[in-house]
Amino acid sequence: MKPKNFPLARYVLGAMLAFLFVGVAQAQTETTSIAEVTYAINNLFLLAAAVLVLFMQAGFAMLEAGLSSHKNTVNVLFKNTFDVCVGVLLYFLFGYSLMYGENPVLGGFFGWGGFGITNNLDNVEGLSPQVDWLFQAAFAATAATIVSGAVMGRMYFKAYLIYSAVITGLVYPISGHWKWGGGWLDKLGFHDFAGSLLVHSVGGFAALAAVVVMGPRIGRFEGNKINSLGYQGITSSSLGVFILWVGWYGFNPGSQLAFVGALNTNTTMLIAVNTTLSAAAGGLAALAFDWITENKRKPNLLVTLNGILGGLVGITAGCDTVSNWSAIAIGVVAGILSVLGTKLLDRLRIDDGVGAWPVHGLCGIWGGIAVGIFSTNVEHKLSAQIVGSLVIPFWAFITMFFLFYVMDLWGILRVKPSQEKVGLDIVEHGQTEKGVEIAFED
């Protein structure tokens, strides 16, 4: 007996198999599309953050130019410009590799992965190595430019060129490797989310080393009297601080390194709010503390501006892991420290032109320690935070002190008194801020 034919059944079975294959192919396509969109959004997020951090250079330039005298404006702006140019190139050549190289050198003192952006670097999964480098290079330039305002009116431009190259190409990447490159501080459990210590205290203590070696500007201290020496534009400085504040939304939220997904999105928003609260609290705390403790002192705008910056620096280490209320407390302490640090420098007759050490150095240390006090993550131990908060500033100060001391011995660090009185715009660059070119011979 011949088997019966079931043409309808065959058609139905064929249709079901075809539908199944189409469904699988469509699911694979949708999965691929979701992955590609996630990749694109996260990389675009980090690119935008990198641009904001790079734009902070404009904030530093405006802040420092406003606090300088008319005769040193071009010099201050030139140094900020140079920091970006030399910073990105040296960080590309070998700084990035020293910081994130997968091959440990000298027992993990720093890493190495070859020159430029190579495949031997500890790149973040899901990010283009190119945009990861761009974000990190903007950080490196930030660490370098902190010193610019502190040394205003005193340092030879050639000495600043040497300093900027050394801190960007060597000092910052090496200490950065200890934490962000997976080095010994990372293994210890030290937490510095966006660089209270790795960026700001490095720059702040480099500034302290510079001003200690060079000494104060002519006329800054006369007996018990402290002279301001004048500044040209409080408007410029105020604008600079607000540019820095806006740039910090690339600095801190950008350090999450991803935006897609509920966890990444919520953490990014927490970081942004904590950054805002700490900055505001720092400004008000500095204003109130200075106003109350200084007899007959009127409310001081510059003190408030530095308090805002202190609050921003202080929250940078733990902005991802503390509550909103803790962020306010961190900002309050940072604002007070910015005032106390300035008073301490004045008492010691140390001339920091913009308060770089109180704001970035001292508040950077506080930011690291604050993680151990306020973090909601039980793995963030106070002991590890204290170690990192002492070692990183010590590294920056010792290396930079040695560099500045050697340059001072060579006679290439501080300008002559006659040159300082004329101003570095004319002495070093032969032009004024108005664009007038003037020859100078000493």
Curated annotation (Swiss-Prot):
InterPro entries: Ammonium/urea_transptr, Ammonium_transpt, Ammonium_transpt_CS, NH4_transpt_AmtB-like_dom, RhesusRHD. The chain crosses the membrane at residues 5-25, 44-64, 81-101, 104-124, 133-153, 155-175, 193-213, 240-260, 269-289, 299-319, 325-345, 354-374, 386-406. Signal peptide: none annotated. The keyword Transmembrane helix applies. Keywords: Ammonia transport, Cell membrane, Membrane, Transmembrane, Transmembrane helix, Transport. One of its GO terms (cellular component) is plasma membrane. The keyword Cell membrane applies. It is found in: Cell membrane. Its main location: membrane. It comes from the Bacteria. One of its GO terms (molecular function) is ammonium channel activity. It is a multi-pass membrane protein. GO terms for biological process: ammonium homeostasis; ammonium transmembrane transport. NCBIfam families: amt (TIGR00836). Belongs to the ammonia transporter channel (TC 1.A.11.2) family. This is Putative ammonium transporter sll1017.
